[in-house]
């Protein structure tokens, strides 16, 4: 017996109107007037640790000559997963978040301009191979499967976690084994490591003699929290930092159930990209000069700090 995976896309005007709220209710998304109000009352932090970052010639010299000449890096960015990247003032306005700050700081160290294009999470990694983007950002976890086709330069340690509706009874304790999800409906993001994990482990419930879990996959963050609030899913699987941030927002009405599986998170590149060494050196420069720590403190993610950036580390086990 296998799980059933439903792929859902919510792109209605109502859902899109709620995206500013989601940005502040976290890695999931909202669909209530309460979340909209919360967004208006929760602006992004105003401190700017990136402002003081300057070009480091020895690091910039690691860039390929064509990138140095153009002075630009094309970044495919998945925006909408706070505290990583979101629109605090609504779509079409300037994005903010940990990933935005780190990418902008890296670009300044390298002496180039970050030309950012908002893209759906599941489209970014395939687009790297086609040359559409030089680098991808979107809280991409480093997994064994992804390392077959993509190169990574790490900048934080995050991973997989679960959250439920506050006061719900479907799941009350930290998930340490996916058999705890048997018989439940899980909502998660399209093209994510969460979707992959749930699909790869689809047989655990049958082996345990239990009813399989069902997975509903959403391309819009706005749909995930709405589904939880309306009782169409029992639990959300998403990023540790995102779900923790979400649960801290009263309007979200969620409870974070803790970490399930830690993952290094990195900038993503096409396999064999000549940009990886320059990015690694730039991240390490930011770690050494203290900018990195200030960015993470700003976004409340200091517990996810790394000591040094690595290229293509193995997946955590």
Features from the language model and the residues they span:
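Ligand-binding clefts/hinges and TM-proximal coupling segments of bilobed small-molecule sensing domains
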Residues: 49-63, 193-209, 255-256, 286-317
